Amino acid sequence: MYKHVLVAVDLSDESQFLLEKAAGVARRNEAKLSIIHVDVNFSDLYTGLIDVNMASMQDRISTETQQSLVQLAENSSYPVAEKLSGSGDLGQVLADAIEKYDVDLLVTGHHQDFWSKLMSSTRQVMNNIAVDMLVVPLRDE
């Protein structure tokens, strides 16, 4: 029996579908449901001098992310307790959230295309967390 289900979303069109899958599990277990989005840390991508205000860009992205998470939660068929966002290493951010919020099931999506088979973030996440995972196939059309 799960007590807290965390669904990792990328804020793409499939995010609502993935959230509804997680909502179904949470509903059946009478569990808490939360969502999380992890942004890449843009400052880590640049090694040279660039005339870009990274702090301003990160703030704007963070605000847009939070608004998207709120909208996603409002459209959920099940109440969403926490709307989390983080930046940095996907596996580490998820592991930290799982520990901090006492999550016992992580729900993620997985694209079944050529590139995802080569470079799946799901594999990395599986190596970093110690709770059950539900990996939902997301088919590209």
Swiss-Prot record:
Keywords, A to Z? Cytoplasm
Which segments of the protein form a coiled coil according to its record?
Answer: none
Gene3D superfamilies per the UniProt record, alphabetical: HUPs (3.40.50.620)
Alphabetical GO CC annotations of the entry are: cytoplasm
- Record's subcellular location: Cytoplasm
Q: Which NCBIfam families match?
A: PRK15118.1
- Entry protein name: Universal stress protein A homolog
The organism named in the record is Pasteurella multocida (strain Pm70)
